[in-house]
């Protein structure tokens, strides 16, 4: 029991292993794609005789089509491009003839080089980091991710508010795409930014309540020093309101400033008669100061709103004073050094209703602004961030007259990957305009706004700008110059099928393709072969730009390849060679029989001599018999004999050969061709042949079978229709093979008939002379009968073949009348998956085997059927053609009453022998098959005899055992 279980388990293990191997093999096959090309049923012009081929290839920007497996640190493997296969040509699998027109359309986007941080960037300049402003601490250039690379974060640059100068964020060439974003204002939290120069993460405290911040916090201030925060009314603060003292002197008063001091003293000794100017002790509003900036608050109370006008981004705190000349302290004299200390901004700062004490209830308290934030109060953009384009990329502080303030792009243009899982922005885009300019190169520059007259070293904070850039961007095969001439042009070369330009070591002359704005173009092949393509890029620096390239083009091909003509390629050369040889041999026989224009009679026998002798003998014999009364003659017989003598004597004429060659020979040998041509409606001649070809009606069907790629694809596509498709394929293939065999038999019959006719005409002088005597008359009659038989035998045969060929062509189009594409045809799915996994995975294939399939067939929606009636009709017609060849031979034999071998029999034998010789190369000829069959029968007989002998021995043994058992029982 245990051993049986082990056997069962062993069998199951073997089966499981085989299944694994089969699935692995099918998986590899399913991964094979030669493109998604299609063979169209009709060409674009609607005419036949051409293969209308469409194909689509993927042209990689890096020109690398081979992957290798790389082991990752976590133990997993990853497929990466083979580092040794960049910059290679791709075989499009499109075969063209010389001067054949190829139409194509290039669709897609590629980036043909990688962008790197420029010098004098937002974080470092050549002044602060000489010679290394664009290099990291390892002296390596810093690459910028591409715009379309959603899986890579942008490069972050820390923008310090202390740097009040224009700096570069991107070097732009024509058609470059750039995506500039700003990191948010980190409120009440820490900020973390990748420092791409140091290769580390920088984390700083960005919580509110501080008056200075690191640049990565997303806020900055240009304010420092002191500013007025309140106003206080100070009594008796200064002396003002100058006036003259009242005079009480009887004799009148004098003015102190107009007299000497001793005079005033004397005048005042008796009474106060010398008066002076006096001042009142006046109050004034004095300033109360605080330090700038005020501590940042997340509620936005000290934050500027976004504006695109610089006047809205600056408050001149130095101009805000509680009273006039408050910054000039009183000197205690009368009058004071200034005479105006009236309130200035007291109401705005302290409030209208506050009239004493310290006042700080004015509107100013609500309008104090010190901070600019990256999220931009109001949400329109990062406040105070300005940008410009600069052609030189130089660092400068000058501000243009018109400032461009950065704004957030619309919500619909914000990349979804720039948000976290909670929908909060990690980066917010402020610039996404492709660089399209007549200028070859320019730099995108940014700076934080601040007055140029202000000392920026006292500024605090800053922003973090993030950059993605797609450099050397091209669309739809268009090309133009950047630092490399004509970068992005799609190039092609045409090489022979056995040649690989990537390994041949040859030097080629690539042709560039000029496309329109939609990527459409066409060209004429300069030679025959396969088209190879690649995208032109800078090959220098060890193919660095190819290695940095990304993206691909879809190149859609459409071309019409003229199908080779069976008539021109096969029949015309065959008939040209055969007819020339046979006609030459026949005329040579005729000429040798009559020694036509021969100066040396040793190489020929002049049959005219024998004809003369026979004719003389005939006249003498018949005349003697008539004179002696042995022969009776009437008028009818006399006329017949004179006609015979005249016909035979005509052969003695020296112009006999010209007559036969110029009139009779061509008329008789071409008789069949003319009748066949009239029946089929096809011409006997083409532009390339001078020998008549009656098989022109076969050109369409045979050219399609032998030379049409579309037909081969249509036939193979039957295999994609499932099990029924295999049956369809076998039946259709057999029908096509029968037609081919029938065609070859018909050609053989025609050749034999033509050769027999030519030979019979060549020996005509001999048989015509047999007309004279009654005992040789039957030879002449048979000669005439066979000549007529061989003349009409091809005509009768072709009459039926022509009709059946047309029917076969029609029904073949019914069966295979569809366009064909190379695509997924046989999906491999896990059986019983619905009982294990959710029903949603029931119809999901693991992989798919690609094959030729009819246009429009979808493996997911079921197989496409073929009308079986048409296939049956196709087979019936094919068998009818095959049988008609032999039937036509028997029909002609009865019509002409000519016994003996016919051209049909001879041609059949010839085609049979040729076929057997061909099959013998693979061991499938009749003799080999017969030998295999006989040996198999012999082995089978030997096996049967062995089994019979073993059975007899077994019966004898059992009988002996039974006898021994009976004897033991009796005892």
Swiss-Prot record:
| Signal peptide span | 1-24
Per the record, a Pfam family?
Answer: TrbL
Disulfide linkages recorded for this protein, renumbered to the chain, are none
Which residues lie in Basic and acidic residues bias regions?
A: 945-954
Gene Ontology process terms (BP):
protein secretion by the type IV secretion system
Q: How does it sit in the membrane?
A: Multi-pass membrane protein
Tell me which domain of life the UniProt entry assigns to the organism this sequence originates from: Bacteria
Q: Which InterPro entries match?
A: Conjugal_tfr_TrbL/VirB6
Q: Localized where?
A: Cell membrane
Q: Where are the stretches annotated Disordered?
A: 127-146, 933-971
Q: Which UniProt keywords apply?
A: Cell membrane, Membrane, Signal, Transmembrane, Transmembrane helix
The Swiss-Prot or TrEMBL record describes its family as follows: Belongs to the TrbL/VirB6 family.
Stated name of the protein:
Uncharacterized protein RT0030
- Source organism phylogeny: Bacteria, Pseudomonadati, Pseudomonadota, Alphaproteobacteria, Rickettsiales
